[in-house]
């Protein structure tokens, strides 16, 4: 039986005559059979059908978007990525040509299609793509200028799942389909009418670098795109390239290379602006071209090995089904039951976005580029190596979600960070492009490693991890290393004063100044390391780090009741504007950052003069619409009400945020998704708990969004979270039970969650006793 879902998926494949009567061509019937097989497989699956890959690909249309402080933050900057979770390369339709900073490869509202890109874009970020290449099919005459070959497309012709993408290009009468494995992509081009067809293959180097070569006899194309990293606002060579090896399953009649509009019959080209290769075919209606592409960060030979290992000669249908099963298993670790289908779509889309990064970086044989290694190759003996840790964002919820659901993967992440520290000499702060970056603030690789350690995730060299974390916390790199992005920014000032004074402008960083935010976040990282030091019996370190964890108090001005810039002599920065963007605050205001003391909320309460004052300050923040969910430093703020006399306000604000900051459709996210952090917040909050202080292993409770949520843990246990609501509007908890016994705390431990069982929330329409 063909379901409504089937019709929705196959609609773009149905041709209509002038009188709008549907009629299927012979070819379309054949294609329809495949689409029905795929759609039936999806229909039988329980969760992948809810994922909306286009969510976050246009400016936010959520209810809260009108209050966003920085309009550039209205772009979530996700892409409709086709690939398994945490893969090396994501395959995406391309509507933007460049690898420029903050420019995603795909935006929903763009009208022109430029091909399928093998992308290393950090999902939801404001960084840049790197080592990418694009495959563009065209028909008719050969055109090599992007402005000439770009073609109109419509969303009515698009189909997207985590495992499959399809669009028709009416201007060329071509259909483009794509699927992927961890390191490889398979693209299928179908002629909808007889014509000359060309494939354009372009390394996307903005620096006019790169290489591409055609082997006509073997039907193979290979090349590379050298990677550039952002460092202090400009690009530098990253010391490795994005390599590709492509095999075409159809003979081509013509081939050559080009640089912009300059076309040549040569079979290779190197280091030219807008370079690429073209392949020509004569296709009859219904004929196809299958393009098998392997990728690597070490060599063309490795890209070929990855291709032959993962794809070989498999057909599109097989890979779509295989990758769909991988996603089904991964997403299916959390099963939600609820009559609200819209919320399920938002939830599973969030869970999909939260499983894009960190990025797999090694080949099938274990080869990977040495961290900051200038084209040096290393080989793993076991496990996998990962990079692109958007650490300032993801230590808060995205990485804790991995710790909760996939602890073995968290071990790989920890081992990868340790390898980086060993190879580069210092534990990196924000490792992207397999390099030091001096981007963002804090030292949150330490926070992640401590969080994993405290949750019993210890499949790595703990002593070496501690050595590297301690080095960051207690030592200053030499001048050359510091300039290269190693070590904590402003560490000497921080150690001398117990805060970073306004006189230290932090010149050697992408984000300069921001002294108060750095102080607050270093205090948290010191606390994180202190927890590990205590467990390892490092008594002296524990004592010093515990004292330093209170450094947040040194930038809290009790006269104004908020965090504030401070000079070396102890005086305060003037004037003071609590709700303005200030140079000593990172991407926010003093009012917003004042609440960043996740490790010592009782200490913050004391500074503020009691629980009631904390509650009043929180009330004021929300009443002024100063809470900025689109930026990470405030993600723990709604849960601070759990420390006041009115924990029901956590339930109120979290329920409001779930409804106002997230939605369906291309504009469904209210800010940069930042490698899945925004999405991970939704996943946790919808389940009914959140790691406001991930290092502690405690989760703050709130009211669950769904009637029932079942979490399957790696240890074989299951936790069922049930919300028993008096009405559809019930969001306030009157009682909680765990395995039939009353549970009266506002937080729950990681260890207790992993024991499984049933957590029941009894919800009502008003706060207070039932």
Predicted regions and their residues:
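Bacterial Sec-dependent N-terminal signal peptides
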Residues: 1-45
């Amino acid at each position: 039986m063909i379901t409504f879902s089937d019709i929705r998926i196959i609609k773009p494949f149905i041709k209509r005559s002038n009188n709008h009567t549907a009629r299927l061509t012979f070819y379309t019937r054949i294609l329809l059979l495949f689409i029905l097989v795929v759609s039936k497989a999806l229909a039988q699956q329980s969760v992948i059908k809810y994922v909306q890959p286009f969510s976050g690909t246009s400016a936010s249309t959520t209810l809260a978007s009108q209050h966003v402080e920085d309009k550039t933050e209205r772009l979530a900057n996700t892409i409709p990525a086709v690939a398994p979770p945490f893969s090396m390369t994501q395959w995406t339709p391309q509507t933007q040509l460049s690898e420029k900073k903050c420019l995603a490869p795909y935006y929903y509202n763009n009208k022109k299609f430029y091909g399928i890109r093998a992308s290393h874009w950090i999902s939801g970020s404001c960084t840049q793509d790197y080592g990418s290449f694009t495959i563009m099919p065209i028909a008719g005459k050969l055109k090599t200028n992007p402005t000439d070959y770009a073609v109109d497309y419509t969303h009515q012709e698009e189909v997207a799942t985590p495992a499959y993408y399809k669009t028709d290009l009416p201007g060329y009468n071509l259909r483009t389909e794509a699927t992927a494995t961890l390191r490889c992509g398979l693209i299928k081009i179908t002629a909808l009418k007889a014509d000359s067809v060309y494939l354009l293959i372009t390394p996307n180097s903005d620096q006019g670098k790169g290489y591409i070569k055609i082997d006509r006899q073997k039907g193979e194309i290979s090349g590379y795109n050298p990677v550039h990293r952002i460092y202090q606002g400009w690009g530098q060579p990253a010391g490795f390239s994005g390599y590709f090896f492509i095999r075409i399953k159809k003979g081509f009649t013509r081939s050559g290379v080009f640089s912009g509009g300059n076309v040549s019959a040569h079979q290779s080209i190197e280091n030219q602006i807008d370079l690429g290769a073209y392949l020509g075919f004569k296709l009859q209606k219904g004929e196809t071209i299958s393009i098998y592409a392997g990728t690597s960060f070490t060599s063309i030979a490795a890209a070929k090995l990855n291709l032959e290992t993962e794809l070989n000669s498999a057909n599109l249908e097989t890979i779509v089904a295989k990758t769909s099963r991988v996603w089904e298993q991964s997403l299916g670790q959390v099963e939600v039951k609820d009559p609200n289908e819209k919320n399920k779509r938002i939830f599973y889309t969030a869970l999909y976005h939260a499983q894009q990064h960190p990025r797999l970086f090694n080949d099938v044989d274990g080869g990977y580029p040495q961290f900051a290694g200038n084209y040096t190759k290393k080989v793993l003996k076991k496990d996998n190596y990962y990079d692109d840790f958007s650490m300032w964002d993801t230590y808060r919820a995205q990485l804790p979600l991995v710790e909760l659901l996939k602890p073995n993967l968290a071990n790989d992440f920890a081992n990868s960070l340790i390898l980086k520290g060993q190879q580069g000499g210092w534990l990196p702060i924000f490792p992207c492009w397999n390099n030091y970056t001096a981007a963002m603030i804090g030292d949150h690789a330490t926070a992640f490693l401590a969080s994993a350690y405290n949750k019993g995730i210890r499949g790595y060299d703990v002593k070496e991890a501690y050595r590297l974390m301690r080095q960051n916390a207690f030592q200053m790199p030499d001048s050359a290393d510091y300039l290269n992005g190693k070590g904590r920014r402003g560490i000497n000032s921080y150690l001398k004063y117990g805060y970073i004074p306004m006189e230290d402008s932090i010149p050697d960083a992408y984000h300069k100044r921001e002294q108060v935010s750095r102080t607050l976040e270093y205090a948290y990282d010191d606390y994180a390391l202190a927890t590990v030091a205590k467990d390892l019996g490092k008594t002296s370190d524990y004592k010093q780090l515990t004292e330093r964890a209170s450094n947040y108090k040194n930038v809290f001005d009790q006269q104004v009741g908020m965090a504030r810039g401070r000079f070396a002599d102890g005086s305060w920065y003037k004037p003071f504007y609590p709700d303005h963007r200030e140079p000593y605050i990172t991407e926010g205001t003093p009012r917003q950052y004042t609440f960043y003391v996740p490790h010592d909320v009782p200490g913050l309460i004391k500074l503020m003069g009691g629980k009631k004052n904390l509650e009043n300050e929180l009330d004021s923040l929300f009443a002024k619409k100063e809470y900025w969910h689109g930026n990470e430093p405030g993600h723990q703020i709604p849960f601070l009400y759990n420390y006041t006399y009115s924990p029901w306000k956590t339930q109120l604000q979290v329920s409001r945020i779930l409804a106002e900051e997230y939605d369906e459709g291309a504009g469904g996210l209210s800010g940069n998704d930042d490698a899945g952090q925004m999405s991970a917040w939704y996943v946790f909050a919808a389940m009914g708990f959140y790691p406001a202080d991930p290092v502690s292993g405690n989760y703050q409770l709130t009211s669950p969004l769904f009637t029932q949520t079942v979490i399957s843990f790696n240890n074989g246990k299951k936790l069922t979270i049930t919300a028993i609501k008096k009405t559809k509007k019930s969001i306030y908890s009157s009682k909680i039970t765990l395995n039939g016994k009353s549970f009266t705390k506002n937080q729950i431990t990681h260890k207790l969650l992993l024991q499984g069982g049933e957590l029941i929330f009894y919800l009502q329409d008003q706060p207070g006793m039932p």
